[in-house]
């Protein structure tokens, strides 16, 4: 008699995805982040669901409903802070996951990679809308500034912004629709993640060496289920340390002030995980140019496979490319720092130099280093 997990139509899909899946024998801890992103998504959907039971998406009551959740709802404070800091953990895992893809050449699976980029945009949109919902000062002004960027689009810009706002400014209609979108998007992300996995399982996983590992595969369970559980425990440890000891560490104090359209905060900035893109946006004096640079800062990942000149897939044995990769990481950290600073000297200049370096690494330096490494190996 065949095992039910191999014969039942539904169990068979789960079995082929998480149990009997052939996996390379040498994948490192950098391959944990995919499953951690799945866990983060589940945590966010569950905590978000419980928050939505008590939240009201009305400009008059949104702020006080969040206060009510923290003060009066049983364990409401911990649900709220797990959700807020869970978003930060989500983005940490996301950046690590993308970084691993760039370092080890996983972008050569173009379908999986492109779905991943689409997922990244969707997650960023969801996080942005979620930041608006508590209706604090930074929520309101963040929504105003970021949506206003669309007005830079020629001809249709102003109409598009007013259409998104549902009026002539960020108001009740905006908050209501942002709540609706924030609720539905995680389910769209879940569907996209399933497609992401579908394409990945067509090719099989990459591995640190970048060499095809078809001749050396091991079953996903128990080897990588155990390995993923270790990553999961570390994720939960870091998340709970954040939630229980310093829940507001990554937030903005201005968001504890109710939204006031008549009073602009001294320095409007998004959450920390958007600061690198925000710094790139601000480094260009022209509004349309800034918006294009903002979009391209993520979209540039789509042309990484096209600009891959090396005959080796992974950077594991390419010291020159490794130096450029870590320069890129340092550059992103610099941009994140600059995004949180006021627009004044010397931060403007540092931001502009860091932005130029960011695009140069992807468009010029990485392809050149690939060609040089090929020559050094006489390929």
UniProtKB/Swiss-Prot annotation:
Q: Does this UniProt record's set of keywords contain Oxidoreductase?
A: no
Cysteines joined through disulfide linkages = none
Q: Which InterPro entries match?
A: Cyt_b/b6_C, Cyt_b/b6_C_sf, Cyt_b/b6_N, Cytb/b6-like_sf, Cytochrome_b, Cytochrome_b_C_euk/bac, Cytochrome_b_N_euk/bac, Di-haem_cyt_TM
Query: Which membrane topology term applies here?
Result: Multi-pass membrane protein
Q: Name one GO molecular function term.
A: ubiquinol-cytochrome-c reductase activity
Q: Which Gene Ontology biological process is one annotated for this entry?
A: mitochondrial electron transport, ubiquinol to cytochrome c
Subcellular localization is given as: Mitochondrion inner membrane
Name what cofactor the protein needs. heme b
The residues the record assigns to binding heme b b566 are 97, 196
* Gene Ontology, cellular component aspect: mitochondrial inner membrane; respiratory chain complex III
Please provide the record's keywords in A-Z order.
Electron transport, Heme, Iron, Membrane, Metal-binding, Mitochondrion, Mitochondrion inner membrane, Respiratory chain, Transmembrane, Transmembrane helix, Transport, Ubiquinone
Q: Where does a ubiquinone bind?
A: 201
Bilayer-crossing residues are 33-53, 77-98, 113-133, 178-198, 226-246, 288-308, 320-340, 347-367
* Residues reported to bind heme b b562: 83, 182
Q: Which SUPFAM superfamilies match?
A: a domain/subunit of cytochrome bc1 complex (Ubiquinol-cytochrome c reductase), Transmembrane di-heme cytochromes
Pfam families, alphabetized: Cytochrom_B_C (PF00032), Cytochrome_B (PF00033)
CDD domains, per the entry: cytochrome_b_C, Cytochrome_b_N
Query: How cofactor binds (record note)?
Result: Binds 2 heme b groups non-covalently.
Role summary: Component of the ubiquinol-cytochrome c reductase complex (complex III or cytochrome b-c1 complex) that is part of the mitochondrial respiratory chain. The b-c1 complex mediates electron transfer from ubiquinol to cytochrome c. Contributes to the generation of a proton gradient across the mitochondrial membrane that is then used for ATP synthesis.
Other notes: Heme 1 (or BL or b562) is low-potential and absorbs at about 562 nm, and heme 2 (or BH or b566) is high-potential and absorbs at about 566 nm.
Q: Which family does it belong to?
A: Belongs to the cytochrome b family.
The entry describes its oligomerization and partners as: The cytochrome bc1 complex contains 11 subunits: 3 respiratory subunits (MT-CYB, CYC1 and UQCRFS1), 2 core proteins (UQCRC1 and UQCRC2) and 6 low-molecular weight proteins (UQCRH/QCR6, UQCRB/QCR7, UQCRQ/QCR8, UQCR10/QCR9, UQCR11/QCR10 and a cleavage product of UQCRFS1). This cytochrome bc1 complex then forms a dimer.
Q: What is this protein called?
A: Cytochrome b
Q: What is the lineage of its organism?
A: Eukaryota, Metazoa, Chordata, Craniata, Vertebrata
């Amino acid at each position: 008699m065949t095992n039910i997990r191999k014969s039942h139509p539904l169990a068979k899909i789960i079995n082929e995805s998480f149990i009997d899946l052939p996996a390379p024998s040498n994948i490192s801890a950098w391959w944990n982040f995919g499953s951690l992103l799945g866990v983060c998504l589940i945590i966010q959907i569950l905590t978000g669901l419980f928050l939505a039971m008590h939240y009201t998406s009305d400009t008059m009551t949104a702020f006080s409903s969040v206060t009510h959740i923290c003060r009066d709802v049983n364990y409401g404070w911990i649900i709220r802070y797990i959700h807020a800091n869970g978003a930060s953990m989500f983005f940490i895992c996301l950046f690590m996951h993308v970084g691993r893809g760039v370092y080890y050449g996983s972008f050569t699976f173009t379908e999986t990679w492109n779905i991943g980029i689409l997922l990244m945009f969707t997650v960023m949109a969801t996080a942005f809308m979620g930041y608006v919902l508590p209706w604090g000062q930074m929520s309101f002004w963040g929504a105003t500034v970021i949506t206003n960027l669309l007005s830079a689009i020629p001809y249709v810009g102003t109409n598009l912004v007013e259409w998104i706002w549902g009026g002539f400014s960020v108001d009740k209609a905006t908050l209501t629709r942002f709540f609706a979108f924030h609720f539905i998007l995680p389910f769209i992300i879940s569907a996209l993640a399933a497609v992401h996995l579908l394409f990945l399982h067509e090719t099989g996983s990459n591995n640190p060496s970048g060499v095809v590992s078809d001749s050396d595969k091991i079953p996903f369970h128990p080897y990588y289920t155990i390995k993923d559980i270790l990553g999961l425990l570390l994720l939960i440890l870091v998340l709970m340390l954040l939630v229980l000891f310093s829940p507001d560490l990554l937030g903005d104090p201005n968001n504890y002030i109710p939204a006031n359209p008549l009073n602009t905060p001294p320095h409007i900035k998004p959450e920390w995980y958007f600061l690198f893109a925000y710094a790139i946006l601000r480094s260009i004096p022209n509004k349309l140019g800034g918006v294009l640079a903002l979009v391209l800062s993520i979209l540039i990942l789509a042309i990484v496979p096209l600009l891959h000149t090396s005959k080796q897939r992974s950077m594991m044995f390419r010291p020159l490319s490794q130096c450029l990769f870590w320069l890129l990481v340092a550059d992103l950290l610099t941009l994140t720092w600059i995004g949180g600073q006021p627009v004044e000297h010397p931060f403007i200049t540092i931001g502009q130099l860091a932005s130029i370096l960011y695009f140069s690494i992807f468009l010029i330096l990485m392809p050149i280093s690939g060609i040089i490494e090929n020559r050094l190996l006489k390929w």
